[in-house]
C-alpha cells in the first residue's frame, strides 16, 4: 500500500480507477457479542459498513460517517483510533446507478467501532437492503462472499479473540 501511495497522487479518490482507498468498520455492540452489518446490494451479501474516502484523508472519520449513513445509527465511537486491519480487496466490475464501474482494487482500512445495540437502525436504500446486528459466531454463516468470509472476516474475528476484544464465541 505504501508503494502505491508513493506512486500515485490520487489514491484517495475514485479518479484512480485501478485502486483507491476505502474505510470499513466492524461496529460492535457494547457487550462485544454482535456486529452491526448491512446487506450490500452490489456484493449481494451481509457485510461490514464502509465506503470510499472520496478525497478525505481522515479514514477513521470516513469509517464512522459510513457506519452512520448505512445503518441509521446516530452515535458511534472508536474502540481505538488505530487502524485494526489493512486489506486489498478486489472489486469485480458492476453497474452502479446506471453506469458500469470496471474491476478495481479497494485499499481498505478497517477500524473497530462501538454503538448501542438499542439505537434505531434503518436501511440506506441506494446501497443496502438490510441492516441487523449479527452475533459474532454467526457472521461467517451469513456472509456469502467466500473470499471475504474466509480471508478477511475470519481473520478479524481471530485477531479480536487474540487481542482480548471478544471472548471465544
Set out the residue ranges of the language-model regions.
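Charged phosphate-binding loop/patch that engages nucleotide di/tri-phosphates or the phosphate backbone
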Residues: 144-169
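Short histidine-centered beta-strand/loop micro-motifs
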Residues: 14-16, 36-38, 51, 122-124
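Short connector loops at helix/strand junctions that flank enzyme active sites
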Residues: 18-23, 30, 41-43, 48, ...
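Acidic, metal-coordinating catalytic segment for phosphate/diphosphate chemistry
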Residues: 1-24, 168-169
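Residue-level signal for pocket-adjacent positions within structured domains
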Residues: 7, 16, 41, 48, ...
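Glycine-rich active-site/cofactor-binding loop and its immediate structural neighborhood
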Residues: 28-30, 35-65
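Short glycine-rich loop/turn motifs
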Residues: 22-24, 33-35, 128
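Unchanged
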Residues: 54-147
Amino acid at each position: 500500500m505504501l508503494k502505491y501511495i508513493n506512486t500515485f497522487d490520487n489514491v484517495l479518490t475514485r479518479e484512480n480507477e485501478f485502486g483507491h482507498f476505502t474505510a470499513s468498520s466492524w461496529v460492535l455492540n457494547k457487550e462485544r457479542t454482535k456486529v452491526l452489518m448491512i446487506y450490500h446490494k452490489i456484493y449481494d451479501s451481509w457485510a461490514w459498513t464502509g465506503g470510499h474516502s472520496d478525497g478525505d484523508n481522515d479514514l477513521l472519520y470516513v469509517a464512522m460517517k459510513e457506519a452512520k449513513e448505512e445503518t441509521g445509527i446516530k452515535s458511534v465511537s472508536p474502540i481505538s483510533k488505530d487502524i485494526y486491519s489493512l486489506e486489498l480487496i478486489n472489486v469485480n466490475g458492476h453497474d452502479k446507478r446506471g453506469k458500469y464501474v470496471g474491476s478495481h482494487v479497494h485499499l481498505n482500512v478497517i477500524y473497530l467501532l462501538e454503538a448501542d445495540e438499542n439505537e434505531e437502525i434503518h436501511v440506506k436504500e441506494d446501497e443496502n437492503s438490510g441492516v441487523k446486528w449479527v452475533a459474532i459466531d454467526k457472521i461467517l454463516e451469513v456472509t456469502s462472499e467466500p473470499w471475504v468470509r474466509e480471508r478477511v472476516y475470519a481473520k478479524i474475528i481471530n485477531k479480536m479473540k487474540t487481542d482480548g476484544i471478544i471472548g471465544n464465541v
